[in-house]
Amino acid sequence: MLDHLSPGQPVDLVGHSMGGNVAMMYAGVRPERIRRLVNLEGFGLPATRPAQAPTRLAQWLDEIKALRRGELDLKTYDSADGVAGRLMKTNPRLGADKAAWLAQHWAAPDAQGRWAVPGDAAHKVVNPQLYRVDEALAIYARISAPVLSVIASDDSLGQWWKGKFTLAEHRERMQHVPQLTEARIEDAGHMLQHDQP
């Protein structure tokens, strides 16, 4: 995509969550392509151990089968109000008016008239590859662009990983980025772009 949109020119790149993690990896693998990078709550994943590989691969195989059977299909909703309710459940800070607006712009009726959120159910399937922190850090060290790492005041990692991966560990990893600036958005959760636009 970058080769099409900006051939030969470095770009400013912004990524949120998984997109922030992907942007960080890309910036270290292709440092000449990135001029500046903003990482919004793109934390990476908990460290893994080689002994986890057999179980992880078995889980991946089981989840691929479940995906093929349609057991992981994304939920659809009766109306845009249902989508708005789901958004507010995921983000308690989101008011009804903003949730209704987002629902209308994020989801759309499918062929059966049910409101569907764009996405790929395959994202529910666990990655068969273990996350290797040492590899991620080697990639971070190659990032030549200035990086702004933005986190929300609410501790998303604590909510998701229950101590398996902490904000302190994330900050320690980010210290491998040569040109790092960190910022914190107050009164915001993981969807900080909704909470404090």
Residue locations for each model-derived region?
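Conserved hydrolase catalytic core segment
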Residues: 4-55
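Internal catalytic or translocation cores that form aromatic/hydrophobic pockets or channels
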Residues: 21, 40, 50-93
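Conserved alpha/beta-hydrolase catalytic His-Asp/Glu region
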Residues: 71-130
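Glycosyltransferase donor-binding loop in the core domain
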Residues: 75, 189-192
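Serine-hydrolase catalytic core
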Residues: 97-98, 136-143
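Short gly/ser/thr-rich secondary-structure transition/capping motifs
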Residues: 126-134, 163-165
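Conserved loop-alpha-helix segment in the C-terminal half of the alpha/beta-hydrolase fold
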Residues: 142-188
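Post-His helix in hydrolase/transferase enzymes
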Residues: 178, 193-197
